[in-house]
Amino acid sequence: MPSVRGCNLPDDLLYDVDNHIWFQEQGDGTVKIGMTAVATAMAGKLVAFTPKRVGRSVRAGKSCGTLESGKWVGPAKSAAGGEVVVVNDDLVANPSIANDDPYEAGWLVILKPEDWDSVLPALVTGNDVTAPYEAKMDSEGFAGCE
């Protein structure tokens, strides 16, 4: 698993580095979406997650939910547009799960994307994510996850 400054970035995911979001194809035409370890470390302990509801549309580049920590409130922006088909209710009930386990238990929503093939070229594969994330962390002045 690639790691940048102590932040794990699993190689089986696709990344929107600019927005600190990961995507995992589910094999049924849907994609699971979550925040990277970098995002959760930068935000601090999450205290609230308000997702778009099941059945709601998400426009590409827009929010699939709002996250809040003690020092930050903001959108989780999805590079893909589509319909929310599943919400992580466990994360709604206990948002800090994303801090402890951003890639398994701490996912945000599952989306049925409208045009996934057009989004793929903009995402970075896990095998290639180290250099872009190193540059992103430099530009944001983030020392790392540890």
Regions found by a protein language model. Name each.
Residues 1-60, 105-115, 122-130, 134-146:
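Acidic, low-complexity mobile loops and tails
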Residues 20, 55, 78-86:
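Generic structural motif
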Residues 25, 69, 78:
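Conserved strand-loop elements at the edges of beta-sheets that form or border functional pockets
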Residues 25-28, 86-93:
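Short, conserved beta-turn/loop elements at beta-strand boundaries and strand-helix junctions
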Residues 40-41, 81-84, 90-91:
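Short, charged/polar surface micro-motifs in flexible loops or helix N-caps
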Residues 58-74, 99, 106-112:
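Short hydrophobic beta/alpha edge segments that flank linear recognition/processing sites
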Residues 79, 102-104:
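Ligand-binding loop in jelly-roll beta-barrel domains
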Residues 92-100:
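Short, solvent-exposed secondary-structure boundary/capping segments
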